[in-house]
């Protein structure tokens, strides 16, 4: 399937011209090269229909042909806006919603923001859709706090959306008056609805606000989180730490299978959403804290806190050495690392394996078809330093005699000491064994002289050693 925007240097889908099966193979090979040395890499989990999966769209306003307002995306490595009416990756409902936004903005005579001159009103439009609920959010990003004729704009937008058979759930104005490439500003005003939408993921319902981190591919997110929870091997008795928890999606998915879940996230708004999501879903065994994950886990480990399972879902730059050091101090039985960057995942696995963890499996998931990005679920377990390994050996294949299998020199010394109080050396034991006809292995530490002078075992100690040999049924 081809796209007209590719010829215009869109850059959003660098692998679109490649057969999807070939894309999956290439991504799987990439993960194998990076992670194969740590443990087995499973087959990549791809999509049946790898199109129109993005439930979040950000469009930038600009001036089009004839001075008419239009919107689109930035060309690769550029600030030039490419007008977009439809996209092979975007949710088709959101394409229609964006068409309605443009029509309403034109009807209200709004002008696009000019970043060079600092003039104009409309900067961006952020759209979100709950895939399971069908709810749609429109966030209009403006360069100034006042939206002229805001009520008229809302009315026009709802009317235009209805023409497209789209029902809008909420409309929010976000104010970004800074000269920056960051999309959202700090101030928001709800123009219509409640300012958030709901969606269902892995059996839980989530409130999604304009700033919420929520995976953009609903289908593959359920695959990703399902793999993560399965990798935790939860029985209902575990204390689980969900680090970098966002709005609580992984932790709340795991809560039904754990004793307690503790989530940590640096974004306070996300933590607010996570707490609300727990209440909305009736989850009473989950707590959430607004804190830097590295600092929080460091303090928790120093205080003697423990977790049975730790979920890690860090940003693209990966985790930190300090975080991993604290993981080792908390000593969870299992660590489940959800990564969006296999390069930083490989770096962090190097540290985790040095700290006594074994990689059981790594499973790549194609969250972003036609792009080069790869998500990976990595399951790790703590090595048991007391773990016993059963090995079947044939005695006739070893350089060891039948008598030697019955007692070691140390066991003979201990027996003699316990029963007679005498201390006997290995040399004395060897002399007595030789007298008794017990065949010994070759002594690789024997003296260089042919007839070396050596002490002879005293009669009293010889009798004690013979009693030990009889006890161990060696004579």
Where are these regions (language model features)?
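Short, aliphatic-rich beta-strand segments
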Residues: 127, 134-143, 205-209, 309
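Extended interfacial segments that mediate partner engagement and assembly in macromolecular machines
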Residues: 11-112, 127, 132, 146-147
């Amino acid at each position: 399937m081809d796209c007209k925007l590719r010829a215009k240097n869109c850059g959003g889908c660098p692998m679109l011209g490649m057969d999807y099966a070939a894309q999956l193979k290439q991504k799987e090979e990439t993960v194998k090269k990076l992670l194969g040395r740590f443990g087995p890499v499973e087959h990549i989990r791809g999509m049946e229909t790898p199109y129109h999966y993005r439930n979040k769209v950000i469009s930038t306003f600009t001036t089009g042909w004839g001075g008419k307002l239009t919107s689109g995306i930035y060309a690769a490595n550029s600030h030039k806006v490419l007008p977009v009416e439809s996209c092979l990756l975007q949710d088709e409902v959101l394409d229609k919603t964006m068409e309605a936004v443009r029509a309403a903005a034109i009807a209200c005579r709004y002008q696009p923001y000019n970043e060079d001159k600092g003039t104009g009103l409309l900067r961006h439009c952020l759209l979100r859709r709950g895939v399971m609920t069908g709810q749609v959010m429109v966030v209009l990003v403006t360069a100034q706090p006042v939206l002229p004729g805001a009520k008229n704009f809302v009315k026009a937008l709802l009317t235009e959306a209805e023409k497209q058979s789209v029902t809008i759930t909420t409309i929010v104005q976000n104010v970004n008056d800074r000269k920056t490439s960051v999309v959202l500003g700090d101030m928001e005003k709800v123009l219509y609805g409640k300012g958030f939408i709901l969606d269902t993921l892995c059996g839980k319902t989530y409130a999604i606000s304009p700033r919420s981190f929520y995976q953009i591919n609903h289908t593959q997110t359920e695959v990703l989180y399902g793999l993560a929870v399965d990798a935790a091997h939860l029985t209902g008795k575990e204390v689980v730490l969900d680090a970098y928890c966002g709005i609580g999606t992984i932790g709340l998915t795991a809560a039904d299978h754990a004793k307690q879940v503790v989530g940590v996230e640096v974004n306070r708004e996300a933590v607010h959403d996570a707490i609300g999501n727990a209440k909305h879903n009736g989850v009473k065994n989950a707590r959430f804290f607004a804190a830097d994950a590295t600092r929080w886990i460091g303090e928790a480990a120093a205080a003697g806190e423990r977790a049975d399972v730790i979920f890690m879902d860090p940003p693209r730059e990966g985790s930190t050495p300090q975080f991993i050091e604290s993981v080792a101090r908390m000593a969870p039985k299992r660590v489940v690392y959800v990564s969006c960057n296999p390069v930083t995942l490989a770096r962090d696995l190097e540290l985790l394996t040095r700290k006594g963890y074994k990689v059981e499996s790594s499973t790549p998931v194609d969250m972003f078809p036609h792009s080069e990005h790869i998500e990976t679920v990595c399951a790790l377990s703590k090595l048991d330093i007391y773990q016993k390994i059963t090995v079947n050996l044939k005695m006739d294949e070893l350089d060891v005699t039948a008598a030697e299998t019955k007692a070691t020199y140390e066991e003979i010394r201990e027996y003699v000491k316990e029963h007679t109080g005498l201390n006997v050396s290995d040399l004395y034991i060897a002399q007595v064994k030789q007298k008794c006809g017990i065949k010994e292995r070759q002594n690789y530490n024997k003296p260089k002289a042919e007839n070396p002078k050596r002490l002879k075992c005293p009669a009293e100690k010889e009798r004690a050693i013979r009693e030990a040999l009889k006890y161990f049924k060696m004579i």
